[in-house]
Structures are given as structure tokens and as C-alpha cells.
Amino acid sequence: MAVAIEAPFHVLAVDDSLPDRKLIERLLKTSSFQVTTVDSGSKALEFLGLHDHEDSPISTQSDQQEVAVNLIITDYCMPGMTGYDLLKKIKESSYLRDIPVVIMSSDNIPSRINRCLEEGADEFFLKPVRLSDMSKLKPHILKSRCKEHYQQEQNLQSNSESNNSSNPTSENSSSSTSSNSHKRKAVDEEILPHTIRPRHS
């Protein structure tokens, strides 16, 4: 009997520093995550299938994303699009907002950390990231999965209730049509004997 093997969680790691990207990739793989690395926020959005200025998936890019991204971990300080900017893009998108996002930074600046957490970041790691930090990722992925499944169940239930509420109307309509047909038949049968009665001279 074949045993189903659960696919590893897929993490998208974003960092403009090659040494830091290599480090986070190694830590994630050691922790049994599947990893994709990119060196900028714009490339991260491209991989996710989202333009910098759009809120919908790009059909031409979506094919390259062969597996769903379960979590995004990004550096804060990057040229062009910062990790904070990337976080905002993700949380503003109805398509991506439920993906957990973790921010990394070499600077321990409370105001920066609070701003990211208020914007929707799930964790804020100080660099250098350690192997022990990886254990904090899975709970966020599982929480996101549970939320996703709950929303799917709610949608299915809503669709089911919508279908059920529309059926009685058609049944009542059919029943009403049938009832009217019987009434007309009864009236015709009542009238018919009088119309064919012969006249007496």
C-alpha cells in the first residue's frame, strides 16, 4: 500500500545580498523547506505573478510558478523596492494577502519592526538569521493553511445554500403550473356536458 508523502512547504526568499541569500537558502533547506530565491522585490512580485502596480495575477507569468508559495521571507533594506514596500504590495493584493511574510534586517530599530508588524508582517528576524529561527516559520504557514481551508468551506457552504434556496422556487412554480392545469381540466369537464346537450323543439 503506497503511503502519501506530503510535499514540503515552499518558501520564497528575497535578498539583494548573495551571501545572505545563500545562508537563508541553506537554513531553509536544512529545515526541510522547498526554497526559491530572488534578489529583489520586483522579481519576487514577478515570480508571484503580480505586476508592481497591479492587483491581479499575470497570466503570462503564472505558468512559471509551478508550486504555490506558502511563505515569503524578505530582507528589509534592498535597493529599488524595500522589504517594507514588498510587504505592502502583498498585503494590498487580494490575490496574495494571505501568504505569511517574514521581514529580516541587520538593524534592530523598534520603530521599523513595529511598522512592519502593523502592516501585516508575521515575524521580524534580526540578521544573521539562525537555524532556530526556522522553527518559527511553520506555525505561520499552518495558520494560513487553516484560514484558507476555512474560507473554502465557507464558500462551498454559501454556494450550497444559494442553490438550495433557488430550487424551491422552481418546484413551487412547477407545482403551481400543474395545479392550474388540473383546475382548467375540471372546469372544461363541467362545461362540456352543457355545451353538447341536444335542444328540444
Curated annotation (Swiss-Prot):
Superkingdom of the organism of origin: Eukaryota
Comp. bias (Low complexity): 158-180
Modified how: Two-component system major event consists of a His-to-Asp phosphorelay between a sensor histidine kinase (HK) and a response regulator (RR). In plants, the His-to-Asp phosphorelay involves an additional intermediate named Histidine-containing phosphotransfer protein (HPt). This multistep phosphorelay consists of a His-Asp-His-Asp sequential transfer of a phosphate group between first a His and an Asp of the HK protein, followed by the transfer to a conserved His of the HPt protein and finally the transfer to an Asp in the receiver domain of the RR protein.
Modified residues (4-aspartylphosphate): 75
One biological process term in Gene Ontology: response to cytokinin
Keywords, sorted A to Z: Cytokinin signaling pathway, Phosphoprotein, Transcription, Transcription regulation, Two-component regulatory system
Family indicated by similarity: Belongs to the ARR family. Type-A subfamily.
The protein's name: Two-component response regulator ORR9
Taxonomic source organism: Oryza sativa subsp. indica
Higher taxonomy: Eukaryota, Viridiplantae, Streptophyta, Embryophyta, Tracheophyta
